[in-house]
């Protein structure tokens, strides 16, 4: 997928394994993986961080192949899913950081421009999540309350 606010085409991406079956050397069962996911979610980790830990420490390449469900669906079934979608959360976090930078460096025109781009991405993503009913229809991004969302 191409980049939104940059000239790069973004063609590089990781390839999923061809076989969708569980490797024979993996000794973890579906329930073991789910318990591990619950434990990591209770520590406050995001779904992608959970996936990285499971991949690097436990040898689970794809949680979906082992459990039959994605990490976020497993968390939703247990009520441990984050309130905001992860990509939206990170964009808001970035916007808060840039706004904090602009408070200290008022003349930084480039940062001001980048903040506009970040916030336009936030609005676009929020509109998408409202149509998919992930966010409530009255949810609105406001820069004044954004720091409370990511705190």
Swiss-Prot record:
Q: Where is this cross-link: Glycyl lysine isopeptide (Lys-Gly) (interchain with G-Cter in ubiquitin)?
A: 27
- According to the UniProt entry, which residues carry N6-acetyllysine? 27
Entry-linked PROSITE patterns: RIBOSOMAL_S15
Q: Which UniProt keywords apply?
A: Acetylation, Cytoplasm, Isopeptide bond, Nucleus, Phosphoprotein, Ribonucleoprotein, Ribosomal protein, Ubl conjugation
- Glycyl lysine isopeptide (Lys-Gly) (interchain with G-Cter in SUMO2) crosslink residues: 43
Q: Which organism is it from?
A: Homo sapiens
**Function recorded in the entry:** Component of the small ribosomal subunit. The ribosome is a large ribonucleoprotein complex responsible for the synthesis of proteins in the cell. Part of the small subunit (SSU) processome, first precursor of the small eukaryotic ribosomal subunit. During the assembly of the SSU processome in the nucleolus, many ribosome biogenesis factors, an RNA chaperone and ribosomal proteins associate with the nascent pre-rRNA and work in concert to generate RNA folding, modifications, rearrangements and cleavage as well as targeted degradation of pre-ribosomal RNA by the RNA exosome.
Q: Which gene encodes it?
A: RPS13
State what protein this is by name: Small ribosomal subunit protein uS15
The places in or outside the cell where this protein is found are: Cytoplasm; Nucleus, Nucleolus
């Amino acid at each position: 997928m191409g980049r939104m606010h940059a000239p790069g085409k973004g063609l590089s991406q990781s390839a999923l394994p061809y076989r969708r079956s569980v490797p024979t050397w993996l000794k973890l069962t579906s329930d073991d993986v789910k318990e591990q996911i619950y434990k990591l979610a209770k520590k406050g980790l995001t779904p992608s961080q959970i996936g990285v830990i499971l991949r690097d420490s436990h040898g689970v390449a794809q949680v979906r192949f082992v459990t039959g469900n994605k990490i976020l669906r497993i968390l939703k079934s247990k009520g441990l899913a984050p309130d905001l979608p992860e990509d939206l959360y990170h964009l808001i976090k970035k916007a808060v950081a840039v706004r904090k930078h602009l408070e200290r460096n008022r003349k930084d025109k480039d940062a001001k421009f980048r903040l506009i781009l970040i916030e336009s991405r936030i609005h676009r993503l929020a509109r998408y999540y409202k149509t998919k009913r992930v966010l409530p229809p009255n949810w609105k991004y406001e820069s004044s309350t954004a720091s409370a969302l990511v705190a």
